[in-house]
């Protein structure tokens, strides 16, 4: 499969689409995929959220949205855009292309956030419960909170893990 392509102009994308013998745009998954990978508005917009097990729209695509999760209204807007801009009208093939693009662009918001953090060297676990709850700052409290936090973090990285 072609991975994410750099965005191109709409005219360049149209020129690269497969056509029928009569010169119309071929209603194919490949054409839909090409549009989702190269269109300046749609390129990089759809991703699979591993945490929620849903397809998300992760960047603005020209209409108001309440949530990142791809919903029926979003599909209608996408269908309208593809029909008006590229002449692509086969809903099933468009949906299949969305599935492929989302699968190629997976993310996990918690893992991504945790992986982006850089430790500044300050010891926080030892004094966290004392600061917020007034607990003793002893070795037992430290080890208990450390175990709890390590378990929470390991669950984000190893799906289904019950404990450390």
Residue ranges and their predicted role:
Residues 1-124, 138-143:
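N-terminal nucleic-acid engagement/recognition segments and initiation subdomains in replication
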Residues 113, 128-131, 155:
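Solvent-exposed, amphipathic alpha-helical segments
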Residues 124-136:
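A short, surface-exposed helix-loop junction/capping segment
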Residues 136-157:
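N-terminal pre-Walker A segment at the start of P-loop NTPase domains
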């Amino acid at each position: 499969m072609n991975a994410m392509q750099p965005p191109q102009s709409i005219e360049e994308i149209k020129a690269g689409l497969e056509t029928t013998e009569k010169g119309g745009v071929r209603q194919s998954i490949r054409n839909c995929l090409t549009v989702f990978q190269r269109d300046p508005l749609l390129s990089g917009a759809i991703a699979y959220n591993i945490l929620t097990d849903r397809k998300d729209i992760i960047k603005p695509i020209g209409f108001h949205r309440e949530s990142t999760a791809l919903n029926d209204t979003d599909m209608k807007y996408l269908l309208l855009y593809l029909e008006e801009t590229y002449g692509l009208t086969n809903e099933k093939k468009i949906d299949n292309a969305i599935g492929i693009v989302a699968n190629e662009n997976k993310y996990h918001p918690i893992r991504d956030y945790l992986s982006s953090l850089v430790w500044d060297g300050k010891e926080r676990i030892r004094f966290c419960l004392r600061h917020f709850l007034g607990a003793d700052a002893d070795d037992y409290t430290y080890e208990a909170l450390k175990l709890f936090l390590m378990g929470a973090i390991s669950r984000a990285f190893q799906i289904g893990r019950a404990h450390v």
